[in-house]
């Protein structure tokens, strides 16, 4: 490239130098700005005490909400299970009454009744785990009566007693046997006297005889 004079050459060189200086200065400035931004991002900002308190409260509220949700879910499941259990018991009750009213019972009906008997006997065994000989005898007697009643129901008559009634009968019979037992294998005389006094005529207050009753009739 040729120049007409030294002045024009000098002017051109100055223009090129300014241009390069501007380019280099801009790039250097942008690099410094990016470095300062990266440094500011890398340094964590200090958290104030107020912000710490807010964060703790939010965490506590979240935990409390989770606990309330779990408790509500547990109660809801418990309510559902209780409803299902009641419906199941009611359906079993309906099924039992339907089978009980049949004159001719099928093999499946007999199996279902036997299952009820076994279930009631198992309930008695769980409630009455006592080694006393007298109570065991009473328990065996109740079991035998339950089996006989089931056979009668299977033939089209009678009703199968529930576990609650059997338990009550068992407790009453056991209490009576224990009260009458004097420890020597005999019934106490006082209880025998009470039985004689209470064995009066039917339909009357114990100890009272009929109006037309006469002592000569006993002779």
From Swiss-Prot:
The keyword Mitochondrion does not apply. One of its GO terms (cellular component) is nucleolus. Residues 27-51, 60-79, 184-219 are annotated as: Disordered. Keywords: Nucleus, Transcription, Transcription regulation. InterPro entries: Rrt14. Residues 34-44, 69-79 have a biased composition (Basic residues). It is found in: Nucleus, Nucleolus. Its main location: nucleus. The keyword Ribonucleoprotein does not apply. Pfam families: RRT14 (PF17075). Belongs to the RRT14 family. Involved in ribosome biogenesis, probably through modulation of rDNA transcription. This is Regulator of rDNA transcription 14. It comes from Candida albicans (strain WO-1) (Yeast). The lineage of its organism: Eukaryota, Fungi, Dikarya, Ascomycota, Saccharomycotina.
